[in-house]
Protein backbone atom coordinates (compact mmCIF):
# COMPACT_ATOMS: atom_id res chain seq x y z
CA UNK A 1 0.00 0.00 0.00
CA UNK A 2 2.95 2.30 0.69
CA UNK A 3 4.20 1.71 -2.86
CA UNK A 4 0.74 2.62 -4.22
CA UNK A 5 0.77 5.94 -2.34
CA UNK A 6 4.29 6.68 -3.59
CA UNK A 7 3.23 6.06 -7.19
CA UNK A 8 0.12 8.17 -6.71
CA UNK A 9 2.11 11.11 -5.28
CA UNK A 10 4.66 10.76 -8.06
CA UNK A 11 1.83 10.79 -10.63
CA UNK A 12 0.26 13.89 -9.04
CA UNK A 13 3.55 15.79 -9.19
CA UNK A 14 4.12 14.75 -12.80
CA UNK A 15 0.60 15.89 -13.75
CA UNK A 16 1.06 19.24 -11.99
CA UNK A 17 4.34 19.72 -13.88
CA UNK A 18 2.64 18.94 -17.19
CA UNK A 19 4.37 15.55 -17.68
CA UNK A 20 1.15 13.76 -18.59
CA UNK A 21 2.68 10.53 -19.94
CA UNK A 22 4.76 10.06 -16.77
CA UNK A 23 1.64 10.69 -14.67
CA UNK A 24 -0.34 8.11 -16.65
CA UNK A 25 2.41 5.55 -16.22
CA UNK A 26 2.52 6.10 -12.46
CA UNK A 27 -1.25 5.85 -12.06
CA UNK A 28 -1.42 2.72 -14.24
CA UNK A 29 1.31 0.99 -12.21
CA UNK A 30 -0.49 1.92 -9.00
CA UNK A 31 -3.77 0.53 -10.37
CA UNK A 32 -2.07 -2.81 -11.11
CA UNK A 33 -1.08 -2.98 -7.44
CA UNK A 34 -4.45 -1.74 -6.12
CA UNK A 35 -7.17 -2.28 -8.81
CA UNK A 36 -10.02 -1.32 -6.45
CA UNK A 37 -8.71 2.14 -5.53
CA UNK A 38 -11.27 4.61 -6.91
CA UNK A 39 -9.00 7.65 -6.40
CA UNK A 40 -6.40 6.20 -8.79
CA UNK A 41 -8.96 5.82 -11.57
CA UNK A 42 -10.24 9.34 -10.89
CA UNK A 43 -6.72 10.78 -11.13
CA UNK A 44 -5.94 8.83 -14.29
CA UNK A 45 -9.22 10.05 -15.80
CA UNK A 46 -8.06 13.63 -15.17
CA UNK A 47 -4.70 12.86 -16.80
CA UNK A 48 -6.34 11.33 -19.88
CA UNK A 49 -8.62 14.38 -20.16
CA UNK A 50 -5.63 16.70 -20.00
CA UNK A 51 -3.93 14.66 -22.72
CA UNK A 52 -7.05 14.88 -24.89
CA UNK A 53 -7.85 11.16 -24.81
CA UNK A 54 -11.45 11.73 -23.74
CA UNK A 55 -12.69 8.19 -24.45
CA UNK A 56 -10.21 6.73 -21.95
CA UNK A 57 -11.00 9.55 -19.53
CA UNK A 58 -14.65 8.51 -19.81
CA UNK A 59 -13.84 4.82 -19.22
CA UNK A 60 -11.86 5.64 -16.07
CA UNK A 61 -14.67 7.94 -14.93
CA UNK A 62 -17.12 5.04 -15.31
CA UNK A 63 -14.79 2.77 -13.33
CA UNK A 64 -14.53 5.37 -10.57
CA UNK A 65 -18.34 5.50 -10.27
CA UNK A 66 -18.54 1.71 -10.33
CA UNK A 67 -16.03 1.37 -7.46
CA UNK A 68 -17.48 4.19 -5.33
CA UNK A 69 -21.02 5.10 -6.47
CA UNK A 70 -21.58 7.56 -3.60
CA UNK A 71 -18.54 9.75 -4.42
CA UNK A 72 -19.45 12.92 -6.32
CA UNK A 73 -16.00 13.37 -7.84
CA UNK A 74 -16.44 10.16 -9.87
CA UNK A 75 -19.59 11.50 -11.51
CA UNK A 76 -17.83 14.81 -12.14
CA UNK A 77 -14.98 12.98 -13.94
CA UNK A 78 -17.37 10.90 -16.03
CA UNK A 79 -19.56 13.88 -16.96
CA UNK A 80 -16.56 16.06 -17.88
CA UNK A 81 -15.33 13.38 -20.30
CA UNK A 82 -18.81 13.09 -21.82
CA UNK A 83 -18.87 16.85 -22.27
CA UNK A 84 -15.56 16.73 -24.14
CA UNK A 85 -17.05 13.99 -26.34
CA UNK A 86 -20.02 16.31 -27.09
CA UNK A 87 -22.42 13.83 -25.47
CA UNK A 88 -24.21 16.60 -23.61
CA UNK A 89 -27.45 14.77 -22.76
CA UNK A 90 -25.50 11.92 -21.13
CA UNK A 91 -23.29 14.43 -19.30
CA UNK A 92 -26.39 16.17 -17.94
CA UNK A 93 -27.83 12.86 -16.71
CA UNK A 94 -24.50 11.99 -15.06
CA UNK A 95 -24.40 15.30 -13.17
CA UNK A 96 -28.00 14.70 -12.04
CA UNK A 97 -27.13 11.17 -10.88
CA UNK A 98 -24.16 12.51 -8.93
CA UNK A 99 -26.32 15.11 -7.19
CA UNK A 100 -28.58 12.33 -5.92
CA UNK A 101 -25.61 11.15 -3.85
CA UNK A 102 -24.05 14.55 -3.04
CA UNK A 103 -26.83 17.12 -3.29
CA UNK A 104 -24.62 20.05 -2.23
CA UNK A 105 -21.56 19.29 -4.36
CA UNK A 106 -20.72 22.67 -6.00
CA UNK A 107 -18.83 21.12 -8.95
CA UNK A 108 -21.77 18.91 -9.84
CA UNK A 109 -24.19 21.82 -9.49
CA UNK A 110 -22.12 24.09 -11.72
CA UNK A 111 -21.57 21.29 -14.23
CA UNK A 112 -25.31 20.67 -14.45
CA UNK A 113 -26.03 24.38 -14.96
CA UNK A 114 -23.46 24.56 -17.75
CA UNK A 115 -24.87 21.49 -19.45
CA UNK A 116 -28.39 22.90 -19.31
CA UNK A 117 -27.07 26.13 -20.83
CA UNK A 118 -25.25 24.26 -23.60
CA UNK A 119 -28.33 22.19 -24.40
CA UNK A 120 -30.52 25.30 -24.39
CA UNK A 121 -28.04 26.95 -26.74
CA UNK A 122 -28.23 23.97 -29.11
CA UNK A 123 -32.02 24.22 -29.23
CA UNK A 124 -31.77 27.94 -29.84
CA UNK A 125 -29.45 27.34 -32.81
CA UNK A 126 -31.83 24.80 -34.41
CA UNK A 127 -34.93 26.70 -35.59
CA UNK A 128 -36.77 23.41 -36.10
CA UNK A 129 -36.43 22.64 -32.37
CA UNK A 130 -38.39 25.63 -31.05
CA UNK A 131 -41.17 24.61 -28.60
CA UNK A 132 -43.98 26.36 -30.52
CA UNK A 133 -42.82 25.10 -33.94
CA UNK A 134 -46.13 23.82 -35.30
CA UNK A 135 -48.09 26.70 -33.80
CA UNK A 136 -45.86 29.14 -35.68
CA UNK A 137 -46.15 27.19 -38.94
CA UNK A 138 -49.95 26.96 -38.53
CA UNK A 139 -50.27 30.72 -38.00
CA UNK A 140 -48.49 31.66 -41.25
CA UNK A 141 -50.41 31.22 -44.53
CA UNK A 142 -47.22 30.26 -46.37
CA UNK A 143 -46.77 27.08 -44.33
CA UNK A 144 -50.30 26.37 -43.07
CA UNK A 145 -51.31 24.50 -46.24
CA UNK A 146 -48.05 22.51 -46.25
CA UNK A 147 -48.90 20.95 -42.89
CA UNK A 148 -51.61 18.83 -44.50
CA UNK A 149 -48.88 16.97 -46.43
CA UNK A 150 -47.55 14.00 -44.37
CA UNK A 151 -44.22 14.09 -46.24
CA UNK A 152 -43.71 17.69 -45.16
CA UNK A 153 -44.34 16.88 -41.49
CA UNK A 154 -41.96 13.92 -41.79
CA UNK A 155 -39.29 16.25 -43.22
CA UNK A 156 -39.77 18.75 -40.39
CA UNK A 157 -39.42 16.02 -37.76
CA UNK A 158 -36.26 14.77 -39.48
CA UNK A 159 -34.68 18.23 -39.28
CA UNK A 160 -35.95 18.67 -35.74
CA UNK A 161 -34.08 15.57 -34.61
CA UNK A 162 -31.08 15.89 -36.95
CA UNK A 163 -30.38 19.54 -37.85
CA UNK A 164 -27.12 18.53 -39.57
CA UNK A 165 -29.25 17.33 -42.53
CA UNK A 166 -30.40 20.89 -43.26
CA UNK A 167 -27.66 21.53 -45.84
CA UNK A 168 -28.93 18.66 -48.01
CA UNK A 169 -32.56 19.86 -47.83
CA UNK A 170 -32.17 23.53 -48.80
CA UNK A 171 -33.00 22.82 -52.45
CA UNK A 172 -36.52 21.90 -51.35
CA UNK A 173 -38.55 25.13 -51.73
CA UNK A 174 -40.75 24.05 -48.81
CA UNK A 175 -37.75 24.15 -46.48
CA UNK A 176 -36.72 27.62 -47.71
CA UNK A 177 -40.29 28.83 -47.09
CA UNK A 178 -40.30 27.23 -43.64
CA UNK A 179 -36.99 28.88 -42.71
CA UNK A 180 -38.40 32.24 -43.84
CA UNK A 181 -41.33 31.79 -41.45
CA UNK A 182 -39.29 30.50 -38.49
CA UNK A 183 -36.48 33.06 -38.78
CA UNK A 184 -38.67 35.99 -39.77
CA UNK A 185 -36.50 36.62 -42.86
CA UNK A 186 -37.62 36.73 -46.48
CA UNK A 187 -35.06 34.29 -47.88
CA UNK A 188 -36.73 34.32 -51.27
CA UNK A 189 -36.00 38.02 -51.86
CA UNK A 190 -32.21 37.76 -51.71
CA UNK A 191 -30.06 38.84 -54.65
CA UNK A 192 -29.23 36.20 -57.23
CA UNK A 193 -25.68 35.92 -55.94
CA UNK A 194 -27.08 34.97 -52.55
CA UNK A 195 -29.64 32.43 -53.68
CA UNK A 196 -27.16 29.55 -53.60
CA UNK A 197 -27.10 28.42 -50.01
CA UNK A 198 -23.58 28.56 -48.63
CA UNK A 199 -22.67 25.81 -46.21
CA UNK A 200 -22.39 26.89 -42.59
CA UNK A 201 -18.85 27.75 -41.49
CA UNK A 202 -17.00 24.92 -39.76
CA UNK A 203 -17.26 25.09 -35.98
CA UNK A 204 -14.23 26.66 -34.28
CA UNK A 205 -11.75 24.15 -32.89
CA UNK A 206 -12.75 23.11 -29.41
CA UNK A 207 -10.66 24.79 -26.78
CA UNK A 208 -8.82 22.44 -24.51
CA UNK A 209 -10.21 22.65 -21.02
CA UNK A 210 -8.09 22.15 -17.98
CA UNK A 211 -9.36 19.20 -15.92
CA UNK A 212 -10.46 19.79 -12.37
CA UNK A 213 -7.81 19.44 -9.66
CA UNK A 214 -8.04 16.33 -7.50
CA UNK A 215 -9.47 17.47 -4.17
CA UNK A 216 -8.10 14.57 -2.17
CA UNK A 217 -4.61 15.02 -3.61
CA UNK A 218 -4.25 18.81 -3.73
CA UNK A 219 -0.95 20.30 -2.55
CA UNK A 220 -1.17 21.96 0.83
CA UNK A 221 -0.96 25.48 -0.62
CA UNK A 222 -4.00 24.85 -2.86
CA UNK A 223 -5.98 23.38 0.03
CA UNK A 224 -5.25 26.44 2.13
CA UNK A 225 -6.16 28.70 -0.80
CA UNK A 226 -9.56 27.01 -1.09
CA UNK A 227 -10.17 27.54 2.63
CA UNK A 228 -9.31 31.23 2.29
CA UNK A 229 -11.66 31.46 -0.68
CA UNK A 230 -14.53 29.98 1.35
CA UNK A 231 -13.86 32.48 4.14
CA UNK A 232 -13.88 35.24 1.55
CA UNK A 233 -17.17 33.98 0.12
CA UNK A 234 -18.76 34.02 3.58
CA UNK A 235 -17.63 37.61 4.13
CA UNK A 236 -18.81 38.60 0.64
CA UNK A 237 -22.30 37.25 1.34
CA UNK A 238 -22.39 39.37 4.50
CA UNK A 239 -21.24 42.39 2.43
CA UNK A 240 -18.10 42.62 4.56
CA UNK A 241 -16.09 43.50 1.48
CA UNK A 242 -12.82 44.50 3.17
CA UNK A 243 -12.60 41.14 4.94
CA UNK A 244 -13.53 39.32 1.73
CA UNK A 245 -10.73 41.08 -0.16
CA UNK A 246 -8.18 40.06 2.49
CA UNK A 247 -9.13 36.39 2.22
CA UNK A 248 -9.19 36.43 -1.59
CA UNK A 249 -5.80 38.16 -1.61
CA UNK A 250 -4.41 35.49 0.71
CA UNK A 251 -5.86 32.75 -1.53
CA UNK A 252 -4.21 34.40 -4.55
CA UNK A 253 -0.84 34.46 -2.76
CA UNK A 254 -1.16 30.77 -1.89
CA UNK A 255 -2.22 29.74 -5.42
CA UNK A 256 -1.27 32.42 -7.98
CA UNK A 257 -2.20 30.14 -10.92
CA UNK A 258 -5.93 30.12 -10.11
CA UNK A 259 -7.79 32.98 -11.82
CA UNK A 260 -10.93 32.43 -9.71
CA UNK A 261 -9.46 34.24 -6.71
CA UNK A 262 -8.77 37.30 -8.87
CA UNK A 263 -12.26 37.31 -10.40
CA UNK A 264 -13.67 37.05 -6.88
CA UNK A 265 -11.76 40.20 -5.98
CA UNK A 266 -13.18 41.83 -9.11
CA UNK A 267 -16.68 40.89 -7.94
CA UNK A 268 -16.07 42.73 -4.67
CA UNK A 269 -14.97 45.90 -6.44
CA UNK A 270 -18.00 45.58 -8.73
CA UNK A 271 -20.28 45.58 -5.68
CA UNK A 272 -18.39 48.56 -4.24
CA UNK A 273 -18.94 50.47 -7.49
CA UNK A 274 -15.23 50.71 -8.34
CA UNK A 275 -15.70 49.56 -11.92
CA UNK A 276 -12.23 50.56 -13.15
CA UNK A 277 -10.59 48.35 -10.51
CA UNK A 278 -13.08 45.58 -11.31
CA UNK A 279 -12.11 45.67 -14.99
CA UNK A 280 -8.40 45.81 -14.20
CA UNK A 281 -8.67 42.65 -12.08
CA UNK A 282 -10.79 40.85 -14.68
CA UNK A 283 -8.18 41.55 -17.36
CA UNK A 284 -5.48 40.26 -15.02
CA UNK A 285 -7.56 37.14 -14.27
CA UNK A 286 -7.96 36.46 -17.99
CA UNK A 287 -4.19 36.68 -18.49
CA UNK A 288 -3.60 34.25 -15.60
CA UNK A 289 -6.29 31.94 -16.99
CA UNK A 290 -4.78 31.94 -20.47
CA UNK A 291 -1.31 31.18 -19.09
CA UNK A 292 -2.62 28.23 -17.10
CA UNK A 293 -5.04 26.91 -19.75
CA UNK A 294 -8.05 27.66 -17.58
CA UNK A 295 -11.55 26.44 -18.44
CA UNK A 296 -13.03 28.65 -21.21
CA UNK A 297 -16.15 29.09 -19.08
CA UNK A 298 -14.12 30.92 -16.43
CA UNK A 299 -12.62 33.19 -19.10
CA UNK A 300 -16.15 33.88 -20.37
CA UNK A 301 -17.31 34.85 -16.86
CA UNK A 302 -14.48 37.38 -16.53
CA UNK A 303 -15.36 38.98 -19.87
CA UNK A 304 -19.04 39.07 -18.88
CA UNK A 305 -18.18 40.86 -15.63
CA UNK A 306 -16.28 43.52 -17.60
CA UNK A 307 -19.38 43.87 -19.78
CA UNK A 308 -21.57 44.22 -16.70
CA UNK A 309 -19.33 46.96 -15.31
CA UNK A 310 -19.68 48.98 -18.50
CA UNK A 311 -23.43 48.32 -18.52
CA UNK A 312 -23.66 49.78 -15.00
CA UNK A 313 -21.88 52.90 -16.26
CA UNK A 314 -24.29 53.05 -19.23
CA UNK A 315 -21.38 52.62 -21.65
CA UNK A 316 -23.35 50.23 -23.78
CA UNK A 317 -21.01 50.07 -26.77
CA UNK A 318 -18.14 48.87 -24.56
CA UNK A 319 -20.51 46.51 -22.74
CA UNK A 320 -21.57 44.91 -26.04
CA UNK A 321 -17.92 44.48 -27.06
CA UNK A 322 -17.08 42.48 -23.92
CA UNK A 323 -20.36 40.55 -23.89
CA UNK A 324 -19.50 39.36 -27.39
CA UNK A 325 -16.03 38.35 -26.20
CA UNK A 326 -17.67 36.35 -23.42
CA UNK A 327 -20.07 34.70 -25.85
CA UNK A 328 -17.17 33.80 -28.14
CA UNK A 329 -15.64 31.84 -25.24
CA UNK A 330 -18.87 30.24 -24.03
CA UNK A 331 -22.47 31.08 -24.87
CA UNK A 332 -24.89 31.31 -21.96
CA UNK A 333 -28.51 32.53 -22.10
CA UNK A 334 -27.92 35.17 -19.39
CA UNK A 335 -25.02 36.88 -21.16
CA UNK A 336 -26.80 36.65 -24.52
CA UNK A 337 -29.89 38.30 -23.03
CA UNK A 338 -27.79 41.04 -21.43
CA UNK A 339 -25.98 41.69 -24.72
CA UNK A 340 -29.27 41.95 -26.61
CA UNK A 341 -30.59 44.34 -23.95
CA UNK A 342 -27.51 46.56 -24.33
CA UNK A 343 -27.84 46.49 -28.13
CA UNK A 344 -31.48 47.53 -27.89
CA UNK A 345 -30.69 50.44 -25.56
CA UNK A 346 -27.76 51.56 -27.73
CA UNK A 347 -29.87 51.45 -30.88
CA UNK A 348 -32.55 53.57 -29.22
CA UNK A 349 -29.96 56.05 -27.95
CA UNK A 350 -28.50 56.39 -31.44
CA UNK A 351 -31.97 56.88 -32.89
CA UNK A 352 -32.80 59.61 -30.39
CA UNK A 353 -29.42 61.28 -30.86
CA UNK A 354 -30.10 61.43 -34.60
CA UNK A 355 -33.32 63.44 -34.15
CA UNK A 356 -32.94 67.06 -35.28
CA UNK A 357 -36.08 68.97 -36.36
CA UNK A 358 -34.04 71.68 -38.12
CA UNK A 359 -32.24 69.16 -40.32
CA UNK A 360 -35.57 67.38 -40.87
CA UNK A 361 -37.03 70.61 -42.24
CA UNK A 362 -34.08 70.99 -44.63
CA UNK A 363 -34.60 67.46 -45.94
CA UNK A 364 -38.34 68.05 -46.26
CA UNK A 365 -37.74 71.17 -48.38
CA UNK A 366 -35.31 69.26 -50.60
CA UNK A 367 -37.93 66.53 -50.96
CA UNK A 368 -40.58 69.09 -51.94
CA UNK A 369 -38.29 70.50 -54.64
CA UNK A 370 -37.64 67.05 -56.10
CA UNK A 371 -41.35 66.23 -55.96
CA UNK A 372 -42.21 69.39 -57.91
CA UNK A 373 -39.67 68.39 -60.57
CA UNK A 374 -41.18 64.90 -60.82
CA UNK A 375 -38.08 63.21 -59.37
CA UNK A 376 -40.10 61.00 -57.02
CA UNK A 377 -37.37 58.47 -56.06
CA UNK A 378 -35.06 61.29 -54.93
CA UNK A 379 -37.92 63.04 -53.15
CA UNK A 380 -38.70 59.81 -51.30
CA UNK A 381 -35.06 59.58 -50.10
CA UNK A 382 -35.19 63.11 -48.70
CA UNK A 383 -38.53 62.47 -46.96
CA UNK A 384 -37.16 59.23 -45.48
CA UNK A 385 -34.14 61.09 -44.09
CA UNK A 386 -36.46 63.79 -42.73
CA UNK A 387 -38.54 61.11 -40.94
CA UNK A 388 -35.39 59.73 -39.29
CA UNK A 389 -34.55 63.25 -38.12
CA UNK A 390 -38.08 63.95 -36.86
CA UNK A 391 -40.19 60.76 -36.63
CA UNK A 392 -43.12 62.51 -34.89
CA UNK A 393 -43.94 64.88 -37.78
CA UNK A 394 -47.11 63.48 -39.41
CA UNK A 395 -46.75 65.65 -42.53
CA UNK A 396 -43.49 63.92 -43.48
CA UNK A 397 -45.27 60.56 -43.69
CA UNK A 398 -48.01 62.17 -45.76
CA UNK A 399 -45.44 63.58 -48.20
CA UNK A 400 -43.65 60.27 -48.55
CA UNK A 401 -47.00 58.53 -49.10
CA UNK A 402 -47.58 60.88 -52.04
CA UNK A 403 -44.22 59.75 -53.49
CA UNK A 404 -45.10 56.09 -53.05
CA UNK A 405 -48.43 56.65 -54.80
CA UNK A 406 -46.66 58.30 -57.75
CA UNK A 407 -44.29 55.32 -57.89
CA UNK A 408 -47.30 52.91 -57.78
CA UNK A 409 -46.16 51.49 -54.41
CA UNK A 410 -49.67 51.63 -52.98
CA UNK A 411 -49.17 49.30 -50.01
CA UNK A 412 -46.24 51.41 -48.79
CA UNK A 413 -48.31 54.55 -49.33
CA UNK A 414 -51.10 53.09 -47.18
CA UNK A 415 -48.63 52.24 -44.43
CA UNK A 416 -47.32 55.81 -44.33
CA UNK A 417 -50.85 57.22 -44.34
CA UNK A 418 -51.75 55.04 -41.36
CA UNK A 419 -48.70 56.36 -39.48
CA UNK A 420 -49.64 59.92 -40.41
CA UNK A 421 -53.22 59.49 -39.18
CA UNK A 422 -52.05 57.86 -35.95
CA UNK A 423 -49.71 60.79 -35.23
CA UNK A 424 -52.23 63.49 -36.18
CA UNK A 425 -55.83 62.17 -36.43
CA UNK A 426 -57.20 65.57 -37.58
CA UNK A 427 -54.77 66.02 -40.50
CA UNK A 428 -57.09 65.66 -43.51
CA UNK A 429 -54.36 65.04 -46.10
CA UNK A 430 -53.53 61.79 -44.32
CA UNK A 431 -57.07 60.57 -45.10
CA UNK A 432 -57.29 61.90 -48.67
CA UNK A 433 -53.93 60.38 -49.61
CA UNK A 434 -54.91 57.06 -48.08
CA UNK A 435 -58.20 57.13 -49.99
CA UNK A 436 -56.36 58.03 -53.21
CA UNK A 437 -54.11 54.99 -52.82
CA UNK A 438 -57.12 52.74 -52.24
CA UNK A 439 -58.86 54.28 -55.24
CA UNK A 440 -55.82 53.58 -57.41
CA UNK A 441 -55.97 49.97 -56.21
CA UNK A 442 -59.66 49.93 -57.29
CA UNK A 443 -60.73 49.18 -53.73
CA UNK A 444 -63.59 51.66 -54.07
CA UNK A 445 -65.57 50.58 -51.01
CA UNK A 446 -62.66 51.21 -48.64
CA UNK A 447 -61.70 54.39 -50.47
CA UNK A 448 -65.24 55.79 -49.99
CA UNK A 449 -65.06 55.01 -46.26
CA UNK A 450 -61.82 56.97 -45.93
CA UNK A 451 -63.06 59.89 -48.06
CA UNK A 452 -66.10 59.99 -45.78
CA UNK A 453 -63.85 60.25 -42.71
CA UNK A 454 -62.12 63.23 -44.34
CA UNK A 455 -65.53 64.84 -44.99
CA UNK A 456 -66.51 64.24 -41.37
CA UNK A 457 -63.52 66.37 -40.39
CA UNK A 458 -64.19 69.04 -43.03
CA UNK A 459 -67.45 68.79 -45.00
CA UNK A 460 -66.32 71.51 -47.42
CA UNK A 461 -63.20 69.62 -48.49
CA UNK A 462 -63.62 69.47 -52.30
CA UNK A 463 -60.82 66.91 -52.76
CA UNK A 464 -62.62 64.45 -50.49
CA UNK A 465 -66.08 65.11 -51.95
CA UNK A 466 -64.82 64.65 -55.53
CA UNK A 467 -63.00 61.46 -54.58
CA UNK A 468 -66.10 60.05 -52.94
CA UNK A 469 -68.17 60.77 -56.07
CA UNK A 470 -65.56 59.19 -58.36
CA UNK A 471 -65.42 56.01 -56.30
CA UNK A 472 -69.21 55.75 -56.14
CA UNK A 473 -69.50 56.07 -59.94
CA UNK A 474 -66.63 53.66 -60.54
CA UNK A 475 -68.24 51.10 -58.25
CA UNK A 476 -71.58 51.50 -60.02
CA UNK A 477 -70.08 51.19 -63.51
CA UNK A 478 -67.71 48.38 -62.70
CA UNK A 479 -67.94 45.44 -65.10
CA UNK A 480 -64.88 43.46 -64.18
CA UNK A 481 -64.50 39.88 -65.31
CA UNK A 482 -64.45 37.28 -62.54
CA UNK A 483 -60.73 36.75 -63.26
CA UNK A 484 -59.99 40.46 -62.75
CA UNK A 485 -61.97 40.52 -59.52
CA UNK A 486 -60.15 37.48 -58.19
CA UNK A 487 -56.72 38.76 -59.24
CA UNK A 488 -57.28 42.15 -57.63
CA UNK A 489 -58.73 40.63 -54.45
CA UNK A 490 -55.90 38.15 -54.02
CA UNK A 491 -53.39 41.00 -54.10
CA UNK A 492 -54.79 42.07 -50.73
CA UNK A 493 -52.81 40.42 -47.88
CA UNK A 494 -55.93 40.28 -45.71
CA UNK A 495 -57.82 38.38 -48.41
CA UNK A 496 -54.86 36.04 -48.89
CA UNK A 497 -54.93 35.19 -45.21
CA UNK A 498 -58.68 34.58 -45.21
CA UNK A 499 -58.58 32.35 -48.29
CA UNK A 500 -55.65 30.30 -46.99
CA UNK A 501 -57.48 29.55 -43.73
CA UNK A 502 -58.76 25.93 -43.97
CA UNK A 503 -61.66 26.70 -41.62
CA UNK A 504 -62.85 29.62 -43.78
CA UNK A 505 -62.58 27.57 -46.96
CA UNK A 506 -64.74 24.90 -45.35
CA UNK A 507 -67.31 27.55 -44.36
CA UNK A 508 -67.41 28.93 -47.92
CA UNK A 509 -67.98 25.42 -49.30
CA UNK A 510 -70.85 24.93 -46.84
CA UNK A 511 -72.39 28.24 -47.93
CA UNK A 512 -72.34 27.09 -51.57
CA UNK A 513 -74.02 23.79 -50.77
CA UNK A 514 -76.36 25.10 -48.09
CA UNK A 515 -77.14 28.86 -48.18
CA UNK A 516 -79.04 28.48 -44.89
CA UNK A 517 -75.71 27.78 -43.14
CA UNK A 518 -74.75 31.44 -43.69
CA UNK A 519 -77.05 32.72 -40.93
CA UNK A 520 -75.38 30.44 -38.38
CA UNK A 521 -71.87 31.50 -39.40
CA UNK A 522 -72.77 35.19 -39.28
CA UNK A 523 -73.50 34.84 -35.56
CA UNK A 524 -69.75 34.58 -35.05
CA UNK A 525 -68.44 38.20 -35.27
CA UNK A 526 -64.97 37.11 -36.43
CA UNK A 527 -66.35 35.01 -39.29
CA UNK A 528 -68.91 37.70 -40.14
CA UNK A 529 -66.10 40.23 -40.49
CA UNK A 530 -64.16 37.94 -42.83
CA UNK A 531 -67.24 37.26 -44.97
CA UNK A 532 -67.91 41.01 -45.18
CA UNK A 533 -64.33 41.53 -46.38
CA UNK A 534 -64.78 38.95 -49.15
CA UNK A 535 -68.04 40.65 -50.16
CA UNK A 536 -66.36 44.07 -50.24
CA UNK A 537 -63.68 42.90 -52.67
CA UNK A 538 -66.26 41.14 -54.84
CA UNK A 539 -65.11 37.56 -54.28
CA UNK A 540 -68.52 36.46 -52.99
CA UNK A 541 -72.04 37.79 -53.32
CA UNK A 542 -75.09 37.04 -51.18
CA UNK A 543 -78.50 37.08 -52.78
Curated annotation (Swiss-Prot):
Source domain of life is Eukaryota
Q: What is this protein called?
A: Stress-induced-phosphoprotein 1
Q: What positions are modified (N-acetylmethionine)?
A: 1
| Residue ranges, annotated region (Disordered) | 191-233
Q: Which residues form the STI1 domain?
A: 130-169, 492-531
Query: What GO cellular component entries does it have?
Result: dynein axonemal particle; nucleus
Q: Which residues carry this modification: Phosphothreonine?
A: 198, 332
| Record remark on domains | The TPR 1 repeat interacts with the C-terminal of HSC70. The TPR 4, 5 and 6 repeats (also called TPR2A domain) and TPR 7, 8 and 9 repeats (also called TPR2B domain) interact with HSP90.
Q: Where is this cross-link: Glycyl lysine isopeptide (Lys-Gly) (interchain with G-Cter in SUMO1)?
A: 123, 210
Bias class Basic and acidic residues marks the residues at 205-233
UniProt xrefs under PROSITE patterns = TPR (PS50005), TPR_REGION (PS50293)
- Phosphotyrosine-modified residues are 354
Subcellular localization = Cytoplasm; Nucleus; Dynein axonemal particle
- Gene encoding the protein: STIP1
Q: Which Pfam families match?
A: STI1-HOP_DP, TPR_11, TPR_12, TPR_2, TPR_8
Q: Where is this cross-link: Glycyl lysine isopeptide (Lys-Gly) (interchain with G-Cter in SUMO2)?
A: 123, 210
Single Gene Ontology MF annotation: Hsp90 protein binding
Q: Which UniProt keywords are present, listed alphabetically? A: Acetylation, Cytoplasm, Isopeptide bond, Nucleus, Phosphoprotein, Repeat, TPR repeat, Ubl conjugation
User: What species does this protein belong to?
Assistant: Macaca fascicularis
Amino acid sequence: MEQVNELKEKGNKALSAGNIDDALQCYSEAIKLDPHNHVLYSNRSAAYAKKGDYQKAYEDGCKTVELKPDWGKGYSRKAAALEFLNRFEEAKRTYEEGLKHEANNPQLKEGLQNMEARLAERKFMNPFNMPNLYQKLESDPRTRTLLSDPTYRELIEQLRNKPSDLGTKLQDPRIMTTLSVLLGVDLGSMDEEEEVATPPPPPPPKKETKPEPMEEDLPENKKQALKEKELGNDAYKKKDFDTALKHYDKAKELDPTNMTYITNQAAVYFEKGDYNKCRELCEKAIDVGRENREDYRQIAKAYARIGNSYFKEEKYKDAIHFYNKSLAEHRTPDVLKKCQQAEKILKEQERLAYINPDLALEEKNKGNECFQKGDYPQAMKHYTEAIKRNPKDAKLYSNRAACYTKLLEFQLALKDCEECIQLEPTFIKGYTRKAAALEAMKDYTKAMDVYQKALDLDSSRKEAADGYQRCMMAQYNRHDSPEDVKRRAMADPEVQQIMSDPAMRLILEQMQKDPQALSEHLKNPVIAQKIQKLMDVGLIAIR
